[in-house]
Amino acid sequence: MDAVEHDLSDAQWSALQAVWSGCAYCGETDGTMQRDCVLPLSRGGRYALDNIVPACRSCNASKCNHEVTGWMRRKKLDERAFLNRLIEVRVMLASQFETS
């Protein structure tokens, strides 16, 4: 098995937590947020700024390796709002953390 590339810096994780202000999926603000891969590593995702969101313990455990939109539909979460916000956050943080 190939080694997983972990590109997310501590500064990027802090910025993600600040911008999302809680769980990216359900909005929960209590407790410590966990790093969740929108596209799971097992499905070809990367551990990088454009694929990580803060998630509460419950959402992170429930989503596991599921595809995000299907999982959100099953949980009756607002997938459209999540995807729109995900794009906004990616654009905002891409300019802040430009790579050379």
Residue ranges of model-derived segments:
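Short, charged surface segments at domain edges that flank catalytic/cofactor-binding sites
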Residues: 1-22, 80-97
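Histidine-centered nuclease catalytic patch
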Residues: 22-54, 63-75
